[in-house]
């Protein structure tokens, strides 16, 4: 009604008048007096496509990010364990490394070539990786099909890479082999200076398993 609209307008005007009447606030900072360490939260960067790391434009961007901060710059890329799938072309959104496959007997085959090239690129620039353990390789997924995502309207993005492992012992061995390989390649001192995390945003659709199944990834 007109009466209600008038009342709302008067209320809004009163708020505006109230804010205008507020007194100014003076803040003084004594820069000569330390109050604690300033954590360089600005020196962490991340992106979806891990293979962008080794491309010309990707390396140029990493150089620029490194120059932004005197503090150590950490880089986190998704999909460091994701499989390529069956598509003949590149998976330009999510990316892949094909680090894990299984032979016909179910024996694991580890291939760290792509992962190494990504981590090498960080190390060469004095950066540190924030190693994201994920996502689920196709041959280890408890629901591998479909694995590739689709971009059509209403298409499924959250496919086989979002599911728990079909065998948690194989998952544990995969993580162990990855860390062991990293220590052999870069040295224990270097690897212990990295940050590690399990998955990305498991509270949303990046994880299609249960809460309990996610927690079991840490066992």
Regions found by a protein language model. Give the residues of each.
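Bacterial N-terminal signal peptides
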Residues: 3-16
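Non-catalytic accessory regions flanking glycosidase/transglycosidase catalytic cores in CAZymes
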Residues: 19-195, 212-219
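Substrate-binding/catalytic cleft of secreted carbohydrate-active enzymes
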Residues: 202-212
